[in-house]
């Protein structure tokens, strides 16, 4: 009488496991850079959306008072920057009394940009030898104020 032995153990061989790990590694190598790219792109888009909301508040301030933040005449492309748009001197959320006809607040609060920095208003922002009034973010590297570089996100409000 012959005895037959059956091995009912099932599982993956070492080669099969290594191939599965290699496939997971390749997929991760493709997915992670794309994830980082879209995360960065999403932050830039969020910043642009917030800048457009600030622009609407800025326009309402200009319509009511004839002024931009820092009590500059609306449309004027000269003057000092405003680094904190939440301050009463900016006139968007509260007034320090220097905005006749103020009927705000024009925005509940000015958020920080997606990288944790304040948005700014610059009514003498220079691009290619032309002056603009602009609102902006210092972008992912957060370098500023008065240090404008390529990663800044700028929304032009008015030009000279």
Model-found features: residue ranges?
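Short, glycine/small-hydrophobic-rich surface segments
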Residues: 58-106, 129
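Active-site and glycan-interaction determinants of carbohydrate-active enzymes
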Residues: 97-111, 138-146
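C-terminal juxtamembrane segment of a hydrophobic transmembrane alpha-helix
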Residues: 24-42
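N-terminal signal-anchor/signal peptide hydrophobic helix marking the start
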Residues: 12-22
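N-terminal leader/signal peptides at the extreme start of proteins
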Residues: 1-12
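Short, surface-exposed interaction loops/tails
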Residues: 59, 114-160
């Amino acid at each position: 009488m012959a005895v037959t032995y059956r091995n009912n153990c099932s599982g993956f061989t070492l080669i099969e496991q290594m191939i599965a790990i290699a496939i997971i590694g390749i997929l991760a190598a493709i997915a992670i850079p794309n994830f980082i790219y879209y995360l960065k792109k999403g932050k830039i888009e969020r910043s642009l959306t917030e800048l457009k909301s600030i622009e609407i508040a800025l326009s309402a301030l200009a319509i009511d008072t004839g002024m931009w933040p820092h009590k500059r005449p609306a449309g004027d492309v000269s003057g000092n920057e405003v680094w904190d748009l939440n301050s009463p001197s900016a006139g968007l959320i509260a007034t320090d009394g220097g905005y006749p006809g103020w009927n705000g607040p024009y925005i509940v609060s000015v958020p920080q940009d997606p990288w944790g920095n304040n948005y700014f208003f610059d009514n003498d922002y220079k691009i290619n030898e032309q002056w603009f009034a602009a609102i902006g973010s210092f972008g992912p590297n957060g370098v500023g104020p008065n240090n404008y570089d390529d990663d800044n996100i700028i929304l032009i409000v008015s030009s000279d």
